[in-house]
A protein has these predicted regions:
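Active-site activation/catalytic loop segments of kinase-like enzymes and analogous catalytic loops
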Residues: 222-256, 272-288
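All-alpha amphipathic helical-bundle segments outside canonical DNA-binding/catalytic cores
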Residues: 117, 259-269
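An alpha-helical support segment within catalytic cores of ATP-dependent transferases
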Residues: 7-18, 137-139, 150-193
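ATP-binding pocket architecture of kinase catalytic cores
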Residues: 43-136
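Active-site acidic catalytic loop and adjacent metal/ATP-binding pocket
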Residues: 34-44, 49-50, 81-82, 176-223, ...
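Conserved NTP-binding catalytic cores of kinases and kinase-like/nucleotidyltransferase enzymes
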Residues: 1-85, 203-206, 324-345
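ATP/Mg2+ or Mg2+-diphosphate-binding catalytic cores
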Residues: 155, 276-345
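Terminal low-complexity/disordered tails
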Residues: 144-146
Length: 345
């Protein structure tokens, strides 16, 4: 249950009054999520979400709010924080930051029912985020750079049980490999960093809202796209080539990948899988969390993806590599043609 800070009916009614929502009709703690406390409020002015940040500092909360307000100003479908009667987007509650957001009707993406049309729309929305975010000038520290993940792994590694020897060997090898083969000089800007099924609210094939900007930072666009591929194009056993092609088609309808990005794509997929394997191992072995959250955030989901991406087991990697090679060759062809056209003038 993701309700770590309990609010009684009186406290919830006071929040409703302070945010000008008339009166509290009903309130429900939300079980989804594993980091923050969330309540769904029903009021005469619609449904709203109360969020209490359990781990973020006030500065981190302010940075996240600044970003979502910027994105909303530019028409991006993301959470809409509302202000209280004093004009504040967040307030203090029990030494934590509390904020209230408009609630979006719709439902999270259902992995088993994800269609080609929906994947194209998700790809397009992600490219829109990257395009809009290029003009965001405020810095947001990247908590998931290679250096930080490598440091985190050293911390986690010392806590892993002895029967994890095989997993440790794989992770040791992957951390060393990526240190030498991750490309740093790639297009960067604001990225979401955590584009999973439950962070995408949809109605039919329309993307209503992208949620959860807690991991958003300035980073490589191709890493963000790789994370979306790992989250949305894996069917539980294999990477689905048709899903991959649909997601990329939607993305490139707004923003074409560069040659360097196509070239870096396989390693960014591996780094994304490594990142979530390590952070979930941390959550399991280092952080005290709800038992249900342990089940929902099983590190093995991404460890198995990593094994496929390393070609240690079958799972559709060959198809992805072929598609990425084709994308690289086509982008190269486009570049050559553009140069020829320019030279003929």
């Amino acid at each position: 249950m993701a309700v770590y800070t309990v609010l009684d009916k009186r406290e919830l009614a006071q929040i409703v009054e302070d945010y000008g929502l008339v009166k509290l009709v009903n309130a429900t703690g939300i079980a989804a999520g594993s980091v923050n406390t969330n309540y769904l409020l029903e009021t005469p002015r619609g449904r709203h979400l109360v969020r209490i940040d359990e781990v973020k500092s006030e500065l981190e909360v302010k940075r996240e709010l600044d970003l979502v307000l910027f994105l909303r100003k530019h028409g991006f479908p993301c959470p809409q924080p509302i202000t209280d009667r004093k004009g504040r987007h967040y307030r203090e509650h029990d030494q934590k930051c509390l904020s209230v957001y408009r609630y979006y009707d719709g439902h999270p993406v259902r992995p088993a029912r994800i269609s080609a049309g929906l994947l194209e729309n998700i790809g397009r929305v992600l490219a829109d985020l990257h395009t809009i975010g290029k003009s965001y000038k405020k810095g947001i520290d990247n908590r998931f750079s290679y250096e930080r993940i490598a440091d985190l792994y050293l911390e986690v590694r010392s806590k892993l049980p002895s029967y994890f020897k095989k997993i440790v060997r794989t992770l040791d090898d992957e951390v060393e490999y990526l240190q030498n083969y991750l490309e740093g000089k790639l297009p960067k800007g604001i990225i979401h960093g955590d584009l999973f099924h439950d962070n995408i609210i949809v109605k039919g094939e329309k993307v209503v809202a992208i949620l959860d900007f807690e991991a958003a930072c300035r980073g490589k666009f191709i890493f963000d796209l790789a994370t979306a591929v790992n989250a949305l194009c894996f069917d539980g056993e294999n990477y689905d080539l048709k899903r991959f092609e649909s997601l990329i088609t939607g993305y490139e309808s707004l923003r074409a990948l560069s040659l360097a990005e196509w070239d870096a794509f396989p390693n960014e997929l591996r780094f994304s899988a490594l990142r979530f394997t390590i952070t979930r191992l941390r959550d399991f072995f280092l952080n005290p969390v709800d038992e249900q959250a342990r089940v929902n955030k099983d590190f093995r989901e991404f460890y198995e993806r990593l094994r496929i991406l390393r070609r240690e087991r079958d799972g559709g990697m060959e198809g992805l590599l072929m598609a990425m090679a084709t994308g690289y060759d086509y982008r190269k062809y486009q570049k050559v043609k553009a140069l020829e056209k320019k030279g003929s003038k």
